[in-house]
Amino acid sequence: MKVDPNKEKALAAVLSQIEKQFGKGSIMKLGEDRSMDVETISTGSLSLDVALGAGGLPMGRIVEIYGPESSGKTTLTLEVIAAAQREGKTCAFIDAEHALDPIYAKKLGVDIDNLLCSQPDTGEQALEICDALTRSGAVDVIIVDSVAALTPKAEIEGEIGDSHMGLAARMMSQAMRKLAGNLKQSNTLLIFINQIRMKIGVMFGNPETTTGGNALKFYASVRLDIRRTGAIKEGDEVVGNETRVKVVKNKVAAPFKQAEFQILYGQGINRTGELVDLGVAHKLIEKAGAWYSYKGDKIGQGRANAGKYLTENPAIAAEIDKTLRELLLSNPSALASSASDDDNVEGNIDLETGEVF
């Protein structure tokens, strides 16, 4: 197609003027954008990284994680912090709920000596701290726990029973407009944890909604719905939760995928158990009866012992993880097909055998 040389000359002149006024890179052709390959941070779960499509949560974006109480929201964000710190990144935790347990965080692999933590008095203060950390360019990951606890200053200074209609939604809307551009420029990942509320009078459709208005739903590049689907037992003792995460919104890859994994109390995401399950599903690990083998060598009798072997041999675990990651990220539908048989399974899981009861 022939291009008018006068138009080309005019376009070059206006692009030059815009770059001179607003800085280099303020406008460019989309194909010239070198940041198109999105940098990501692992969630701590291989199946969730694959379900997200890009291999983890995207840097420079806003992410919302929501679900019922005790579903694993804070645990998932602490796993993200631990993964980021292993890569040498700086992380901050804005604890609006004033409920962060440093001992539990340490058990999940978080370096609490280098984790920045703030317990703000008001919602405005929390969001201003987020903005200041973002603009500094020195912080890579910020967690806000939670949107429901970001109480506007007017509500705190008022009396219980006073009406404060729409204050939190207005505060969040202003913050989103301010933060979105700064996050992109500083390449900072901002994760909001949110709670679920019920809409009154809803007869048809889903009555659940999240707090803080609609602004966060629009500005978030990724929204994750996390649910507890069953209990994990060792004998009669409950030692963890079966967890399902649905990717409700995804601007960096295909949405609506889901991942299932285990969260063990005091340990976090059961990564080795996940490697065993996915390894068997994709023929990397052989299973004969109760015995599991990798490259011809037996690694354990029973799923728990195979997982224990991988925990004690991190080099082999890393090798399996790398192979699975390359296989599944190049063909995400393989994860869906391997999980299809279990999509409707809800109940209790025996940690040793992996059987549902």
UniProtKB/Swiss-Prot annotation:
CDD domains xref list: RecA
- For the ligand (ATP), the binding residues are G67, P68, E69, S70, S71, G72, K73, T74
Concerning SUPFAM superfamilies, the annotation shows:
P-loop containing nucleoside triphosphate hydrolases, RecA protein, C-terminal domain
Query: PROSITE patterns annotated for this entry?
Result: RECA_1 (PS00321), RECA_2 (PS50162), RECA_3 (PS50163)
GO molecular-function terms, A-Z: ATP binding; ATP hydrolysis activity; ATP-dependent DNA damage sensor activity; damaged DNA binding; single-stranded DNA binding
Q: Which InterPro entries match?
A: AAA+_ATPase (IPR003593), DNA_recomb/repair_RecA (IPR013765), DNA_recomb/repair_RecA_CS (IPR020584), P-loop_NTPase (IPR027417), RecA-like_C (IPR049261), RecA-like_N (IPR049428), RecA_ATP-bd (IPR020588), RecA_C_sf (IPR023400)
User: What GO terms describe the biological role, i.e. biological process, of this protein?
Assistant: DNA recombination; DNA repair; SOS response
A GO CC annotation given for this chain: cytoplasm
Q: What is its main location?
A: cytoplasm
> What are the protein's UniProt keywords?
ATP-binding, Cytoplasm, DNA damage, DNA recombination, DNA repair, DNA-binding, Nucleotide-binding, SOS response
Q: What family does this belong to? A: Belongs to the RecA family.
Its recorded name reads Protein RecA
Q: Which organism is it from?
A: Shewanella oneidensis (strain ATCC 700550 / JCM 31522 / CIP 106686 / LMG 19005 / NCIMB 14063 / MR-1)
Task: Please name the gene that encodes this protein.
Answer: recA
